[in-house]
Amino acid sequence: MMAFDVETYENDFSVILEIGFVVSSLARPEDSKEAFHFIITENSHFVNREYVPDNRDKFEFGTSERMSLKEAAAKFMQHIRDADFLVTHSGAHDEAYLASAGISLEGKHMFDTQLLALALLTSGTAVFGLKRLLSDLAIPFDEDILHNGGNDAVYTMKLFLALTKKI
């Protein structure tokens, strides 16, 4: 399985700044994680600061790699081929961002932790951000490194695993 997150420029969501993902085994998901974080070089001059922090240099679960969007898309596609399913948080947006970069998720089953949380934890129509759900489920996280594509992918995987225990 593979959890992913895409960070975009806050004033133009078509500008992809980072792609992060974590690959994990279905058999032992807690023990087998490999995290990736790609910083898109041609968009490095776009900096988030109004609505979300620019945390692209705060990847804590591996080493960030700087590369073109074309190269990042190719590497992402190499890993997605082997994934049984995908995990995301509020994934409709990320799916659209990836599609704009030529990355198709068609044919892949996708679990959205935001929708899973809505179904499992509430009886209403509340929408929960990643930070809120991590906190509500007592999953340890560092708030200062959220809004980094790689970190958010890792936290999304942890959230998914916690939610599956509630089924």
What is the predicted function of each stretch?
Residues 15-17, 34, 50-53, 99-100, ...:
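Short coil/turn segments at secondary-structure boundaries
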Residues 71, 75, 90-93, 97, ...:
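Acidic, Ser/Thr-rich intrinsically disordered and amphipathic helical segments
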Residues 20, 79, 97, 116-119, ...:
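Alpha-helical recognition domains of nuclear gene-regulatory proteins
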Residues 92-110:
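Substrate-recognition/cap helix-loop segment adjacent to the acidic, metal-dependent catalytic center
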Residues 2, 10-93:
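Conserved non-catalytic scaffold segment of RNase H-like nuclease domains
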